[in-house]
């Protein structure tokens, strides 16, 4: 089958050795950097700049980069620990790179990034873009997939919008006739 995959993350993210890493502020290491209302183009430009910077750091450090990871503690809290990763350029990918790689391996994925601010209703332009993506999935008999960071807010918004579109498509005429 085919997949219409929509990434709803607003935060810049890089995949390093297959694991996602996000930009964080030094004084708020457990909180994503928020850029409310940022466009997809800006997020992807930031990701490409971070990718260039991290690749340059790896060249300067003989293939090593310093990252930070979250480690769960027994009390339910998290600690931030430094981790040295050994990398090559091909190990440092943007989300778009990841999906292009998946497509190049023969998977039929129609990927798009639609940046949505977490825990806020999508603005009309974003709603329209999501409507187009869902309609494309319906028209091409594809699966519709949404992702964000945690799968609680933005992914849920995408799924609710998809459900509304499918419901109106399937039952809209019947609903109109009942009134």
Task: Please give the residue ranges for each predicted region.
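Glycine-rich nucleophile elbow surrounding the catalytic serine of serine-hydrolase chemistry
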Residues: 152-159
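Cysteine-based protein phosphatase catalytic domain of the PTP/DSP
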Residues: 1-143, 160-179
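Short glycine/threonine-rich catalytic loop with a Thr-x-Gly-x-Asp
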Residues: 149
């Amino acid at each position: 089958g085919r997949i219409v995959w929509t990434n709803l993350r607003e935060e810049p993210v890089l995949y390093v050795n297959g694991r996602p890493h996000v930009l964080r502020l030094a004084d708020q290491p457990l909180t994503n950097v928020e850029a409310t209302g940022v466009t997809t183009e800006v997020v992807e430009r930031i990701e490409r700049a971070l990718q260039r910077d991290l690749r340059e750091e790896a060249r300067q450090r003989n293939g090593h980069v310093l990252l930070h990871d979250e480690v769960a503690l027994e009390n339910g809290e998290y600690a931030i620990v430094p981790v040295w990763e050994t990398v090559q350029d091909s190990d440092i990918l943007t989300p778009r790179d990841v999906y292009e790689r998946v497509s190049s391996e023969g998977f039929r994925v129609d990927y798009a990034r639609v940046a949505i601010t977490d825990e806020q209703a999508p603005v009309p332009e974003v709603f329209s873009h999501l409507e187009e993506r869902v309609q494309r999935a319906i028209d091409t008999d594809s699966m519709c997939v949404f992702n964000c960071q945690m799968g609680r807010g933005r992914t849920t918004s995408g799924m609710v919008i998809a459900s509304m579109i499918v419901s109106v498509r399937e039952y809209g005429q019947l609903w109109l006739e009942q009134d």
